[in-house]
Design a protein with these regions (language model features):
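Charge-rich, low-complexity N-terminal segments
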Residues: 1-46, 50-52
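Charged, low-complexity interaction tracts
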Residues: 35-172
């Protein structure tokens, strides 16, 4: 397969994965700060006898994609909360962006710090449900790669996907 066709096929693959991943983030409402959305990138380098295609995103994107098991609710994921809760401070800006204003039984506003703690405890117990915002477009785009490209370069989808996740975790 000539190099120019390989490059075009891989560019289409990269662009499809990125655009669909961003679309999924927006559709599943996991895009409140736009930080993860804006961080999804793909770097393609085609050489004489090989190519490299690396996807990158914010570290926490891997956990949003694969999910995290809580102490009470389990998901099919390698990640889990065991003994430490996520820091409640991490949810403070999210609460503000979402416009959540908690009230007590008397109708008075309660402290945002209390709500942050309750959300952190809920995430610790119930985990983060896998969204597969990146996994699904990656696998779908892989199926649409030209067969000769897969055969010539010996591409294995699972191995390729696992390498991408490892790269994201290492570079983040």
């Amino acid at each position: 397969m000539e190099q120019e066709r390989v490059k075009k096929a891989l560019e289409r693959f990269r662009n499809h994965v990125i655009s669909q991943s961003k679309r999924n983030l927006t559709r599943t409402q996991k895009n409140s700060s736009k930080k993860l959305y804006n961080s999804i990138k793909g770097d393609l380098k085609v050489h004489q006898n090989s190519f490299t295609l690396e996807f990158s995103m914010e570290d926490y994107g891997v956990y949003q994609d694969a999910g995290v098991s809580g102490v009470k609710k389990k998901y099919n994921t390698p990640y889990s909360y065991k003994s430490k809760m996520p820091p409640s401070k991490a949810f403070d800006k999210w609460i503000t962006r979402k416009g959540l204003a908690p009230r007590d039984s008397g109708g008075k506003f309660s402290k945002r710090k209390s709500l942050s703690f309750l959300i952190a405890r809920s995430v610790y117990r119930n985990g983060i449900k896998p969204s597969l915002f990146f996994t699904k477009p990656f696998e779908a785009a892989y199926k649409n790669l030209p067969e000769e490209l897969i055969e010539e370069y010996g591409l294995d989808a699972i191995e390729l996907f696992n390498e991408q996740i490892d790269t994201i975790l290492e570079n983040g």
